[in-house]
């Protein structure tokens, strides 16, 4: 399961133009 905080970090990375890392980010 992915935590909401982790998803927020992934979203921020995507919006920032960088490649998100972490198992949760791979599901986006």
UniProtKB/Swiss-Prot annotation:
- Tell me the keywords, alphabetical order: Lipid-binding, Transport
Q: Name one GO molecular function term.
A: lipid binding
Q: Which InterPro entries match?
A: Bifun_inhib/LTP/seed_sf
- Could you confirm whether the keyword Transport appears in this record? yes
Q: Does the keyword Transmembrane apply?
A: no
Q: What does this protein do?
A: Binds specifically fatty acids. Possible structural role in association with these lipids.
Protein name from the UniProt record: Non-specific lipid-transfer protein 2
Q: What is the lineage of its organism?
A: Eukaryota, Viridiplantae, Streptophyta, Embryophyta, Tracheophyta
């Amino acid at each position: 399961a992915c935590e909401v905080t982790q998803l927020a970090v992934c979203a921020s990375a995507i919006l920032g133009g960088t490649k998100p890392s972490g198992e949760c980010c791979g599901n986006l």
